[in-house]
Amino acid sequence: MNYGEKAPALWDAIKNEEKRQEDTIELIASENIVSDAVREAQGSVLTNKYAEGYPGKRYYGGCQYIDQVEQLAIDYAKKLFNAEYANVQPHSGSQANMTVYNALLKPGDTILGMGMDAGGHLTHGSKVNFSGKIFNSVSYDLNPETEELDFEKIRQIALENKPKLIIAGASAYSRIIDWQKFREIADEVGAYLMVDMAHIAGLVATGAHPSPIPVADVVTTTTHKTLRGPRGGMILSNNKKLGKKIDSALFPGTQGGPLEHVIAAKAQAFYEDLQPEFSTYIEQVVKNAQAMADEFKKSENIRVVSGGTDNHLMIVDITKTGVTGKDAQNLLDSVNITTNKESIPGDTRSPFITSGLRIGTPAITSRGFKENDAREVARIIIKVLDNPEDKDVLTEAKSSVKSLVDKHQIK
């Protein structure tokens, strides 16, 4: 075998995945479609280079161009979010959160985050995650009537438990979040406030959602999802003193060598996000989500949690269809619509089964879908879930999906 010879089975799988993406309507809220330039940066020769440390302070030689790349990513990120400090080295959103915890907390400290069935993330204190094992985690839920954040209840929980860190942000919440109310609660109990804006970072960057940067002590995010970049993480703050603690908590505290090829891809994505067209894109993402939510609300058997959406996603309660979230995910997969099962507030089913679906519009909007297309996708989903065993309905749905993906091909 020659050095560099492609492994046939591997490249067959990659080609098949490329075809799957082309042929599928992608509605997973955390997924998107990156530009060729982002992919090219991530596949560049930077993958060959070790660069422990930070720009100008490396443990290896030969980092002069690596320093330029990482500094560009930092500068673009700071400009994009109007932040004083940015660390672009976290390998993921989870690593970004872990780094902040390591910088601000000690094992056993109390943290307060959104519960999983309310829309929180594993790293916000789930008992099966490091965040719930290393720290004393307490959770807040949603108001059962409005299915929105209940700040008076959150305040009561904070006063009772005196957390050292309050975590705002979610992985499945469709409404605008009032960062200032979280700040007031944090100040009242003497806690740090961390915002995890992984899902809504693109909306924050364009002003479609209020920014947490001026309010929170520290903000974490992923760089994919609505930012349309490579899979990775980032930490932002306006507190430079805190930034120094975070830098050392990340390296050498949490990670070793940064993935500079991914950081290059982050820089390219941030550059794209700074262009006027990105604001137009995010505006369309929200319009598409709201169009889908409005269509779902016409259904007798599908209920939109909280009654609608202000961002890129929605949670739908499909209990009345008689189909579980797990079965709905598989059923929609069979007609080339990709979603993910999701717990609804107060769900009695396990997270592996669920009574709902999480649906997002970043990827279809990157393909050029507009409101009418989004409504049509919602109608297809409604018909499939109302007729899960009707083969004619499933065949028709698959044909409708093909028409939409042929109309809006991945560029």
UniProtKB/Swiss-Prot annotation:
Site feature Plays an important role in substrate specificity, where: 224
This protein's UniProt keywords: Amino-acid biosynthesis, Cytoplasm, One-carbon metabolism, Pyridoxal phosphate, Transferase
Xref: Pfam families: SHMT
Top-level taxonomic group: Bacteria
Chief location: cytoplasm
A GO MF term: pyridoxal phosphate binding
Main EC class the enzyme belongs to: transferase
Cofactor(s) the record lists: pyridoxal 5'-phosphate
Entry's localization field: Cytoplasm
UniProt GO BP: glycine biosynthetic process from serine; tetrahydrofolate interconversion
Catalytic activity, as annotated: (6R)-5,10-methylene-5,6,7,8-tetrahydrofolate + glycine + H2O = (6S)-5,6,7,8-tetrahydrofolate + L-serine
Pathway note: One-carbon metabolism; tetrahydrofolate interconversion; Amino-acid biosynthesis; glycine biosynthesis; glycine from L-serine: step 1/1
EC number of this enzyme: 2.1.2.1
GO cellular component, one term: cytosol
Binding, (6S)-5,6,7,8-tetrahydrofolate: 120-122, 350-352
InterPro entries, per the entry: PyrdxlP-dep_Trfase, PyrdxlP-dep_Trfase_major, PyrdxlP-dep_Trfase_small, Ser_HO-MeTrfase, Ser_HO-MeTrfase-like, Ser_HO-MeTrfase_PLP_BS, SHMT-like_dom
Entries under HAMAP family matching the protein: SHMT
NCBIfam families: PRK00011.1 (NF000586)
Protein name, per record: Serine hydroxymethyltransferase
Source organism per UniProt: Lactobacillus gasseri (strain ATCC 33323 / DSM 20243 / BCRC 14619 / CIP 102991 / JCM 1131 / KCTC 3163 / NCIMB 11718 / NCTC 13722 / AM63)
